[in-house]
Amino acid sequence: MRAIGRQLNEEADRRDAASRKDPSASTVRRGRLLGRADANAELVLYAEAWSRKIQLNMTFDMVREAAKQPHADPLVTVAVRSDGSVESVAFVRSSGVPAIDEAIRRIVHSQANYQAFSPALLREYDVVEIRRTWHFDMAVRLY
């Protein structure tokens, strides 16, 4: 009986310790491209291909009405998994117009799956975070 009680106490201690861990602590290997330049050429090429896909396959009609409202250029970080699926879309700076922000989320998710990581990129990362400023004029441009 004592052995069972000791085992239950040890399991409870492990659960308590796990619940106190930083929730952002993760074993996922992340690459972050917060601008256009990075020492990792594979990461830059992947992010440029991702941006090109968004810009070339997106019609301005998706945001035309919302973009007529006064708004800021949103700064958005998109996390892409190694298989090309979208992990998250996070706004560093909102456009100030909920319809535009929601349209960006729809655009990002509607064009997934993105290209899977190259073998070189896969050796280093499980997830790549790409940050871009979205600008709407006669088209959608990612800077």
How would you describe each model-predicted region?
Residues 1-37, 52-58, 81-93, 102-143:
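Conserved "boundary/linchpin" sites in short secondary-structure elements
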Residues 62-67, 120:
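Surface-exposed patches in mature extracellular/periplasmic domains of secreted proteins
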Residues 66-68, 92-96:
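Short acidic, glycine/proline-enriched loop segments that cap or flank alpha-helices
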Residues 69-75:
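Short, small/polar residue-rich loop motifs at catalytic or cofactor-binding pockets
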